[in-house]
Amino acid sequence: MQLKRVSIVISQLLCIFSFSQAVNSCEDKTFWQTWYQGGQFKGFGISPTKEAVAKAQYLFAENHYKGNLLTKDYKRALDLFKKAADAGLLQAYFRLGLMNHYGQGKSKDLKSAYTYYEHAAKTNNPEAQFNLGLMNRYGIGTKKNLYTAFDWFTKSANSQTILNQNKCTKIMKGVVEAQFNLAQMNHYALGTEKNIFEAAKWYEIAAAHNMKEAQFNLAQLFFTGEGVDYDIDRAIENYLLAAKQGLAEAQLNLAQIYHYGPSHLQNYQKAHQWYLEAANQDVKEAYFNLGLMAQYGRGVHQNYVSAKHYYLQSASPKIPESYLNLGFIYHYGLGTPVNNDKAFEYFDKAASQGIHQAEYHLGIHYRDGRGVTKNNDIANYWFKKAKAKDLKEKDYINDSFAFREPDDVDLYVK
């Protein structure tokens, strides 16, 4: 009776999912789908093969795992994947790896996940190989080993022949994330010698698959000329691709090229547009530059109120020029009433970060008693400190607003 019940279940499975009895199962568009060869089941009294049972278990498990046609049930899926794996179906090991990795249907077990991924990798499963690469790169579920990570990323990044549960072969393209990681490993000498040429090759391959991080890093190489020929046009092309996908670093760099770049590339309207996009992701540098554009009327009408708003958004120890410019706004009453207390506060913050113009104007406030008790000794201290920068007097007396030169050209997505 047990044998008959198993046969009935498998037969019902065929009916439920309306499987064709294809002459050549390898032609199926859904490569991992389970197929049953014509003539395999001849009646309820015929015992299904161990392989057929494993395939049925795998199919049931997949549908419980994804919630397709069957109720989503991780615990049931886990049990069936285990049975299929125990019966020798290697494809089940990858799912077991994922379920242990992310705690689906059971508690998270990274060591077991690693072991299951290793079994799955024997079938040239590129996703399993990629996960093994990540786990070795970051020491997840195993000891950190960059050399092993590099090997797994190399396998996963390249096209390879894989075998499904019906022993059909298929060429699988490399995993894009593995291609990006392989580029990084070559770029930063992780598990291999530094090779910018190889890094650029793999960034370009991943970028062709529309991976924004790869597009950005490729743009950086072209922009800096690191390991490749300097090519500002290709840099802009790749920044633009990444920026349109919402990568804040690309939006900022693209804006800075249009803002500060060579005259034939300057376009204040485009710069303003991309600064706004980056600012919407709370990029402080973008806020600061929007303040400058509002202050000087570049790409927009001059507006001190808007400038102050953006400087307040960007003000931080990492961008002390914002403090200086706010100091000037309150010192001279630009778009707001003169406020010596506020001016002193912001000059003091900028001076604490070594901004020489702020040091000089802090001296003025102490000398004249603006926003602070008059104190000539402290005033002279700040005047001397500003002059000690060995700058020409016009540099630190000049009341011009501070510009912040683009300083993120060496920033790569890691």
Predicted regions and their residues:
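Short helix-capping/linker turns of helical repeat alpha-solenoids
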Residues: G39, G45, K50-V53, Q57, ...
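Ankyrin-repeat and related helical/solenoid repeat scaffolds used for protein-protein interactions
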Residues: E321-K385
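Classical Sec-dependent N-terminal signal peptides that target proteins to the secretory pathway
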Residues: M1-S25
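Terminal, low-structured helical/coil segments at or just beyond the last alpha-helical repeat
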Residues: T373-K374, I378-K414
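Hydrophobic face of amphipathic alpha-helices that form TPR/SEL1-like repeat modules
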Residues: Q57-K66, L80, R95-Y102, N131-Y138, ...
